[in-house]
Amino acid sequence: MKGSSALLLVALSLLCVCGLTRAEDDNEFFMEFLQTLLVGTPEELYEGPLGKYNVNDMAKSALRELKSCIDELQPVHKEQLVKLLVQVLDAQEDT
């Protein structure tokens, strides 16, 4: 639960700080951010979804710690999060 709460807090903070305005952009950014957080590296976060933003050292440190928490999840839990993400992405493509 701690990791989930931290993930939600960081993701919502990033959406607010980045100042994304359109709903489609919000969804696309959020889904790419989650996907990279689940299966990518911190560097891929900075080059991908956060690439156009100036991520300060404290935020990078927080993201590395969050990524570490996600990477330490039991494999079955991480697998279920990835499956959930795939469901959401598939549902978005259908609309």
From Swiss-Prot:
Keywords: Secreted, Signal. It is found in: Secreted. Residues 1-23 form the signal peptide. Disulfide bonds: none annotated. Its main location: secreted. PROSITE patterns: SCGB. GO terms for cellular component: extracellular region. It comes from the Eukaryota. PANTHER family: SECRETOGLOBIN FAMILY 1 MEMBER, SECRETOGLOBIN FAMILY 1C MEMBER 1-RELATED. Belongs to the secretoglobin family. This is Secretoglobin family 1C member 1.
